[in-house]
């Protein structure tokens, strides 16, 4: 695993909403470059940039029409390369968002695959043999091509699924992972990875990583596929980092990923922390962290230290943290996020407590996710400093509430969420026990009870973390000898 991941703290950038440098209402590469110092000053030393490739943007860029060309609305390939260069000057690393499971219907591969006459792309996607046959248990598109067949889709109906084969074959049109079509698809995706890694990218966050091989309930085929990719990367790009959207670390890390996310879907109980009716990190003190801890311990033991289990503050698919938590609750939530093993991921704006905006019209397939994708709030100038464009031209409307937080206001307030997170990041970087590879031992995580406590350790260094998000004082007994306090916030336990 790349050495730089030992102390990596990631910042997720949704590029169209981060910073607009040319007044067209859409964030861009130059805007990201202008704000690298801000991210670096916060303490984050790595970026994850959401899809920024050519796309008709039916799903905000997760419908790629050309994997090797930057979307013109953000800039050029050279502009993106400059992000890599400028980040590296600041000892920062950059992950791009790879979408290997499907493309847009506008991709040239799909246009060729739709043709009735066989060609090199005929098996690049998953097709049935007849337009009258629908793939069981999978969505499809049909009746849009000369080719006789229905094409499997992964998500929206304009996102045809790329063909990596079937682990278990039960229909004549299904191909095995070892057939020529699936093997060519995998090699084509390796070529995409080569292209960007050679340009200076440091690795990839991989979209829907656990779903590439079909009829693969236990994930054995998909694990084998990613092990193949890991061999290729270790051979050609040994420092490239990979994080998966899988949500099952024992499978992802076995497949060769360095990191896997705990997510709002899957078995992790991640939602119990911040995104349920009674979150554990709410002041009401009615939450339960025990199920999360049980699943975390299970994943931690199964993963056998093959990689990192990452707990994000949020992402572009989730409600914002601040939808359910107030500023003090957020401070304690970040004390948790920044003291756990794995690499922390901070979604842009979460560090200032940006709100989820209700009742926004869907933009580019966002639907109820749109409220978490509003423009970054830099200051109280026009459009919160995001863009000089007329407000009606903005990609998504900016939060217009009077109490909206801004970077400018938060930086000026010593007691702000931003400054608390900055302090927590500095502490994390100062103690190896708090970093990615430090061990963890849970010592108090009882059902429906507070506080929550664990010990982080590395060699002879040990740090006890005690968290009581509730509004009630709690007793905590332990037989440890404590030398000094590293960090303290709120009332005494």
What are these regions (language model features)?
Residues 2-184, 198, 209-257, 376:
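Acidic/aromatic-lined carbohydrate-recognition and catalytic surfaces
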Residues 5, 236, 248, 253-256, ...:
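Loop/helix patches that line or flank the sugar-binding groove of alpha-linked glycan CAZymes
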Residues 12, 48-51, 204-208, 243-245, ...:
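Short beta-strand segments
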Residues 45-46, 91-93, 193, 202-205, ...:
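Beta-sheet entry/capping signal
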Residues 105-141, 226, 230-375, 380:
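Conserved alpha/beta catalytic core and glycan-binding cleft of carbohydrate-active enzymes
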Residues 179-192, 196, 287-297:
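A Trp-anchored, charged/polar loop motif used as the substrate-binding/catalytic surface
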Residues 190-215, 309-318:
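Active-site groove signature of glycoside hydrolases
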Residues 470-493:
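C-terminal beta-sandwich/jelly-roll accessory domains of carbohydrate-active enzymes
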């Amino acid at each position: 695993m790349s050495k730089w991941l030992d102390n990596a703290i990631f910042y997720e950038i949704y590029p169209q909403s981060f910073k607009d440098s040319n007044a067209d209402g859409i964030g861009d590469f130059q805007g990201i470059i202008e704000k690298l110092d801000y991210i670096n000053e916060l303490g984050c030393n790595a970026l994850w940039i959401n899809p920024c490739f050519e796309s008709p943007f039916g799903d905000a860029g997760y419908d790629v029409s050309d994997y090797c060309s930057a979307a013109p609305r953000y800039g050029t390939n050279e502009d993106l390369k400059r992000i890599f260069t400028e980040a590296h000057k600041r000892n920062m690393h950059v992950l791009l968002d790879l979408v290997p499971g499907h493309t847009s219907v506008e991709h040239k591969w799909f246009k060729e695959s739709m043709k009735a006459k066989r060609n090199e792309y005929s098996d690049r996607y998953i097709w049935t043999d007849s337009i009258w046959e629908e793939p069981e248990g999978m969505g499809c598109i049909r009746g849009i091509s000369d080719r006789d067949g229905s094409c499997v889709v992964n998500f929206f109906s304009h996102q045809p699924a790329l063909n990596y084969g079937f682990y278990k074959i039960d229909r004549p049109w299904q191909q095995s992972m070892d057939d020529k079509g699936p093997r060519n698809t995998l090699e084509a995706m390796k070529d995409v990875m080569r292209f960007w890694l050679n340009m200076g990218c440091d690795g990839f966050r991989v979209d829907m990583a656990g779903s590439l091989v079909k009829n693969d309930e236990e994930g054995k085929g998909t694990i084998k596929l990613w092990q193949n990719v890991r061999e290729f990367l270790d051979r050609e790009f040994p420092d490239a980092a990979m994080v998966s959207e899988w949500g099952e670390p024992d499978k992802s890390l076995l497949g060769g990923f360095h990191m896997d996310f705990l997510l709002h879907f899957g078995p992790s109980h991640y939602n119990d922390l911040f995104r349920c009716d009674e979150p554990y990190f709410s002041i009401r003190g009615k939450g339960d962290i025990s199920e999360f801890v049980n699943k975390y311990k299970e994943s931690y033991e199964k993963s056998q230290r093959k990689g990192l289990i990452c707990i994000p503050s949020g992402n572009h698919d989730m409600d914002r943290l601040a939808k359910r938590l107030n500023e003090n609750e957020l401070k304690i939530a970040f004390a948790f996020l920044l003291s756990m093993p794995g690499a922390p991921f901070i979604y842009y704006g979460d560090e200032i407590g940006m709100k989820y905006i209700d009742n926004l019209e869907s933009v580019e397939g966002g639907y109820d996710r749109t409220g978490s994708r509003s423009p970054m709030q830099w200051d109280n100038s026009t459009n919160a400093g995001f863009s000089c464009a007329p407000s009606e031209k903005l990609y998504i409307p900016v939060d217009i509430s009077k109490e909206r937080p801004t970077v400018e206001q938060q930086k000026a307030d010593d007691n702000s969420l931003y400054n608390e997170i900055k302090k927590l990041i500095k502490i994390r970087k100062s103690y190896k026990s708090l970093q990615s590879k430090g061990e963890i031992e849970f010592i108090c995580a009882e059902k429906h009870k507070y506080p929550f406590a664990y010990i982080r350790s590395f060699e002879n260094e040990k740090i006890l973390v005690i968290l009581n998000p509730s509004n009630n004082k709690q007793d905590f007994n332990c037989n440890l000898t404590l030398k000094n306090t590293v960090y303290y916030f709120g009332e005494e336990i």
